[in-house]
Amino acid sequence: MSQHELPSLPYDYDALEPHISEQVVTWHHDTHHQSYVDGLNSAEETLAENRETGDHASTAGALGDVTHNGCGHYLHTMFWEHMSPDGGGEPSGALADRIAADFGSYENWRAEFEVAAGAASGWALLVYDPVAKQLRNVAVDNHDEGALWGSHPILALDVWEHSYYYDYGPDRGSFVDAFFEVIDWDPIAANYDDVVSLFE
């Protein structure tokens, strides 16, 4: 069984300042994200041991831990990749066209996404729904409650308090605005291209 590892950041810890502080990035990546990696590895080890011994007394808890920590790990990995010190602006190309087609305009999409970010107690996601073949905004509680089965995340924004409270206090809206100052549309567009190639 392979061990999951904490990925390195694609930029320096202070690279997103003044929008997101070095302290928050350090805590968030090195402590919070690491805890999900550790929790996922531990849960998978428990499941492997239980399958070997046939004793499943701890299996239910481990299954829940895989879901919680796995989603936390995977979404955080996307979150780091979706920011850059050279970010900001709006999407272009095929992704921009699809956002306009599915939401009416970029402005409509962003307004709805910001509502999702304000409503969620976990994550705001832009996902591709392969059943309806359209983009959707999703408000996810924790890491794994409220997700749309079968959908593929294109963009991930962490709105847990540990993402912003040190920098912005209870003003989550200012943190969301700050995220859009550092958003990197290139990997998001690549995610979109990859998933559309599978279903359209």
Swiss-Prot record:
Give yes or no: UniProt keyword RNA-binding: no
Write down the required cofactor(s): Mn(2+)
Q: Which organism is it from?
A: Halobacterium salinarum (strain ATCC 700922 / JCM 11081 / NRC-1)
Residues crossing the lipid bilayer are none
Similarity comment: Belongs to the iron/manganese superoxide dismutase family.
Q: Which protein are we looking at?
A: Superoxide dismutase [Mn] 2
Keyword vocabulary terms for this entry:
Manganese, Metal-binding, Oxidoreductase
Q: Which gene encodes it?
A: sod2
* Domain of life, per lineage: Archaea
